[in-house]
UniProtKB/Swiss-Prot annotation:
CDD domains listed in its UniProt record: INT_Rci_Hp1_C (cd00796)
Keyword tags: DNA excision, DNA recombination, Heterocyst
Purpose: Essential for DNA excision. Site specific recombinase necessary for the excision of the 10.5 kb hupL element during heterocyst differentiation.
Official protein name in the record: Excisase C
Coiled coil: none
Organism, as annotated: Nostoc sp. (strain PCC 7120 / SAG 25.82 / UTEX 2576)
Entry's Gene Ontology BP terms: DNA integration; DNA recombination; DNA repair; heterocyst development
Iron-sulfur listed as a keyword: no
Length: 498
């Protein structure tokens, strides 16, 4: 290569390396999910959540593969004699280099090698691989390449020193969002991951399979299952190279009394009773707040919504629109299971609970405009439970949702329609109403079936009686016809006399 050409080549390498080295790493991830809308495969169940995670991972992998192709195309176009290849969970640099020390290939002075530098196969790793490709290309162009610890893989092995859980935790959020959308849902989920790890694992312990499993196996039930789920995400995020060898516990949900309709209606009035009997408050924002929480209660009871589905960008304009003839509530796409339009399970409660009253809706709108983060939404969600306790309601907010699932079953609403309305899969919906289907609801179901059978029997008897009456009348008509045919003169005489 001439000195002039070599100089141009070096200038190309220098500029490109500088561009990649100084590029903000967030640029690599900013548009990854710009047009990505995963199908609403999650209903909050483990299977549904995993389906959505899988869809997101496939999107990430597609973007990664596209960027890898682009990187190799750019390297080739700029005549850099290095390419990048993926092997398992790592990226390697492929180049034709002088023979490695100890390589006895006869009759050769050069050979194609795949260099392992300890670079992970993700977008951040690809950025590093591109930088290393330009650096290696520069050495090849200058004929100054030498086999050293870095290219022999010695340093990469040293780099694989196991870090503590605390060291990884400091980088957890950054790594987590490199492969996931930053949505309201994910921002709500992630702080819980951090909290679970901090509460349960000594941060000074090494992030090894044995250390994780020792803690997980020391607890039972829901806590164990939560640790398995969170730790699995943690391990996968950092590609620690192992999987947990622990089994989830089978947990039987605690018994819950799902409220009957009369109790739901009675409890609605507890909000106003509380407001009338409470001590005076000088905080103007809190004087009428009870009306908004009563409205929230009514909506949960009527529609079977998740509490968050009332607070995440509520479409109040649609709710109050004259065009909303079916009184549906539109759940925002940024909620747990995505967009859906919900039909009221008990339409008459819209009027009974005065759910179209603009006053509580204005309070809600004012509250929602103050929401600056996911944390604010969580505060509002927790406030519902606090208000239930404050006014003396004896059940939990989610029990109203379970009541809708049971009610739909008793009403004979097709399972698929009810599941879609609640944002469930059919399986999850069936589990829900079967789990909380108590003795009173069984009595009601039996009573309705028996009542329907009694009604059918009554209708059958009525039909039989009508048929017998019809037969009697038919015979009377036939008898009359017969007597008329037998004595026509008598009939004529009777006619003239009349």
């Amino acid at each position: 290569m001439s000195g002039q050409n070599q100089g141009n080549c070096e200038e190309t390498y220098s500029t490109s390396t500088h561009e990649y080295a100084n590029a903000d790493s967030t640029d690599w991830f900013a548009d990854m999910f710009a047009d990505f809308e995963p199908q609403n495969t999650t209903d909050g169940s483990y299977r549904g959540t995993m389906a959505k995670i899988k869809a997101t991972e496939l999107q990430y992998q597609a973007v990664f593969e596209q960027k890898l192709v682009e990187a190799n195309t750019n390297l080739k176009r700029e005549r850099i004699r290095v390419s990048i290849k993926q092997t398992g969970n790592s990226l390697q640099l492929r180049a034709t280099l002088p023979l490695k020390p100890g390589d006895g290939s006869l009759g050769k002075t050069k050979k194609q090698y795949d260099l392992s530098l300890g670079i992970p196969a993700n977008l951040e790793g690809l950025k590093t691989a591109i930088e290393e490709s330009y650096e290696l290309g520069k050495l090849i162009a200058r004929h100054t390449f030498e086999w050293n610890e870095k290219y022999l893989g010695i340093k990469s092995r040293e780099k694989q020193e196991i870090k503590t859980i605390g060291e990884l935790l400091d980088k957890f959020e950054e790594k987590y969002y490199q492969t996931r959308q930053k949505t309201i849902t994910s921002q709500n989920t992630f702080p819980n991951y951090i909290s679970v790890i901090k509460r349960n694992f000594p941060l000074t312990h090494l992030a090894t399979k044995e250390n994780f499993e020792e803690i997980i196996n020391s607890v039972q039930g829901n806590k164990k299952n939560e640790l398995i789920a969170v730790t699995s995400v943690f391990i996968k995020t950092f590609n620690l190279g192992f999987q947990l060898d622990v089994k989830r516990d089978n947990v039987t949900p605690a018994h819950r009394e799902i409220p009957e309709d009369d109790k739901i209606i009675y409890s609605f009035d507890l909000f106003e009773k509380f407001a009338l009997n409470r001590k005076n408050t000088n905080i103007s924002d809190e004087i009428d707040t009870w009306e908004m929480w009563r409205w929230v209660y009514g909506m949960l009871a009527t529609f079977g919504l998740r509490p968050r589905e009332l607070f995440v960008q509520p479409d109040i304009n649609w709710w109050m629109s004259p065009q909303n003839l079916d009184h549906t509530w539109k759940v925002n796409k940024n909620t747990k299971t995505g967009y859906r339009e919900v039909i009221p399970f008990v339409p008459e409660w819209i009027e009974l609970f005065d759910l179209k009253n603009p006053k509580p809706l204005k309070i809600l709108e004012k509250k929602v405009t103050k929401i600056a983060s996911v944390q604010n939404i969580n505060w509002m969600r927790r406030d519902i439970s606090r208000w239930f306790r404050k006014v003396g309601i004896e059940f939990q907010p989610y029990d109203l949702r379970h009541a809708c699932a049971i009610r739909a079953h008793l009403q004979g609403i097709p399972i698929k329609a009810a599941a879609d309305n609640l944002g469930h899969t059919v399986d999850e919906h069936t589990k829900t109403y079967q789990r909380w289907f108590g003795i009173e609801n069984r009595k009601k179901a039996f009573g309705e079936v028996i009542s329907q059978k009694s009604l059918i029997e009554l209708q059958k008897n009525e039909i039989l009686a009508l048929r017998m009456e019809n037969e009697r009348l038919r015979l009377e008509v036939e008898k009359l016809k017969f007597s008329t045919t037998k004595n026509p003169e008598d009939c004529e005489q009777l006619y003239h006399q009349g």
